[in-house]
Amino acid sequence: MAAHAAAAPADTPVPAPVPASEARAGKDTDPAVRVLPTVDVSGSANAGWRARSASVTGRDDASILDTPASVTVVSAARIADQQARTLADVLRNDASINADYTPVGYYGNFTIRGFPLDPASAIRLDGLTLSGEQNVALENKERVEILKGLAAIDSGVLSPGGIVNFVSKRPENVSSVTAGVDSRGSTSAAVDLGRRFGPDKQFGFRINAAKENLHSYVDDANGRRSFASLAADWNITPRASLQVNAEFQQWIQRSVSGYQLLGGTVVPPAASASKLLGVQPWAKPVTTDALNLNARFDYAFNDDWRAYVTGGRSRTMIDDNVAFAYGCAYVPSCGAGGTSPFFFASNGDFDVYDYRSPGEYRRNDEVRAALAGKFSTGALRHDVLFGVGALHRVVRLSTSVYDYVGSENIYGPDLSFDPSPNSASQSYPQLDAWQVSLFASDKISLGEHWQVLAGGRQVLLRQRAWTSQDGEPTRTDRSKFLPQLALVYKPAAPLTFYGSYSKDLSLGDQAPVRASNAYAFLPPLESNAYEVGAKYDWANRLTLTAAAFTISKPFEFAQPDSTDAGYTFVQRGRERHDGIELGASGRLTERLSLNATLAAIRARAYDSGTPAYEGHQVINVPALRATLNADYAVPGLPGFDLLGGLEYSASRTANEEGSARVPGWIVVNAGARYSTKLGGHRVTARLWVDNLFNRYYWRDAGELQGDAYLFIGAPRTARFSVTYDF
């Protein structure tokens, strides 16, 4: 109930895919014809998993090696090899990213460098902000880009952790069908169909569609989804191009409640990964309808100057239903030992609530225009970007049903209760927010070895927020200049050192229902980020990265006090995260490609006025995390690759006081890919096994709206798919 209560293939003898830019332009097309903007993910036939460029920083096709920020790119090929179904699966490739309340059957929430991502602003599609309250489909995505820490120059109001950007596949001549199955009985089918046509191949379209029957490892939590998308391109002239994208997905699945600490201090021992807490026969599934639209027009004035205008709409409609397991206020055992009613009782008793919130409506409308150019002033070379953007965010919610219906025990049998007789009210506006930003940056080259990046954005935020249907809105008006500065030193072409500073503005959180100021929106808060790093391109085959960072922002938490509620949600003190990241991505040998990441983060709260919340790691942020994924082309077996993965997480705190911890864990994944030709058509079979050794572990100890929840990781699951190109 989230807002409920309260690959580029590795080196093999198989020919590598034609880079997207070549596939669209065609080797025999007029070289003067300008094709639509692209990002080279695979780089060359032997580049393995090494991305060369990304657009998530706000500059199209920016070289990752020369960018003074930490960027991760996960290609469509790796997504396919790992049989990823959701963003949560994709983000497991980076150690700096963690699940932060990601229940089965609902959209996921995540942290980057320990800071929660705001789904209203930190999730993007083709550079435009999505309504992130959705599980974005992956069938039509060319790659997923992650920017850590430093915000993109064209961002508006944004959480300090970073940005996740989905990049859509562009039209090219492609025809393929994919069928898949997993060991739990899930089945899926997908089609990918694209063509370029016209006298100069100036027109193009690409259609993706998918249907999936979802069988969860949690009992009674099965579901289904349907997806369709269209991408269209038009190279209007050699200098002008237009692209349009539309996608729709419906996801219907029962949502799974998380466990809570027993007595507020103990991680539930021997808890079942397959038990649907509070399951009731009358509980309906959650239905999420997501529609994402965008368009972009590019115009090149000459080789040095170009402009673009882009805009989009992202809309989600959620019928949120769940028999929600929460707290123990209605059971006698709750008072034993002074247990807070906001946790499960010490013996495992918990309350069940009939929660219904139909017609949750969230919409992001965004438009942006920018001018980019290059010029020289004496010995200085300038690469400039100027732009303006506007984002309108609308949220409408109903007065939900949230009624107690009975109590159960996590170790006991499932019990049936009568649903609440009450009905939800009609929806009302909860949020109406405008963000307008002016941004500019100049990358100045000082000779051959030094670059200075200076820029910033002026952000105007105007927001109205309602806490009840009949109440007066809380108004927020804020104007702030947010600078970005970076210094880059390149002693040699393959080596980059950098240091950067940025200031960001993010929206304040909403107080949880249990606080004395329930539902109140806290004011916007400013964060500061410092980062130094190094990047090395070894032998044009392996990219090595290292970064150290410090990010701080006001600490938001439910502060114990003498009010009737016992807590007030406040901003007080600072929360600072200091960390080191290491990474390696690319081709280690002629046959072995890998992606390895490591993140060590020290996350602390200071000057909060609540000593129990200080002096230890912030909730759900592991001090050390690492990932390793590899692709090995087996000699003597053309087209056959062995795949493997490893994820490690240190233990993490599970409550604000730091008195409870979930243990660390190691999960091993394995798979294989075989690609051959049958009758002149490419056929690719993929096998991937998550959690190969069936490790029992707590994958998520996240906090939502002031309450802490625990989710058990999925047991061993095998997925198999076959793709046929025709």
Language-model region placement:
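Surface-exposed extracellular loop regions of Gram-negative outer-membrane beta-barrel proteins
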Residues: 252-263, 394-396, 462, 487-531, ...
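Acidic, small-polar-rich N-terminal luminal/periplasmic segments of exported/outer-membrane proteins
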Residues: 31, 36-177, 532
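Gram-negative outer-membrane beta-barrel transporters
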Residues: 449, 550-552, 570-656, 723-725
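Acidic/polar loop-and-plug regions of large Gram-negative outer-membrane beta-barrel proteins
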Residues: 212-216, 229-235, 239-300, 313-362, ...
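Membrane-embedded beta-barrel scaffold of Gram-negative outer-membrane proteins
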Residues: 298-300, 306-312, 316-324, 497-498, ...
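Structural signature of Gram-negative outer-membrane beta-barrels, strongest in the C-terminal barrel
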Residues: 235, 362, 380-393, 429-553, ...
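Outer-membrane beta-barrel translocator/receptor signature
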Residues: 140-142, 153-230, 236-240, 291, ...
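Conserved C-terminal beta-signal and adjacent last beta-strands/turns
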Residues: 360, 384, 530, 619-726
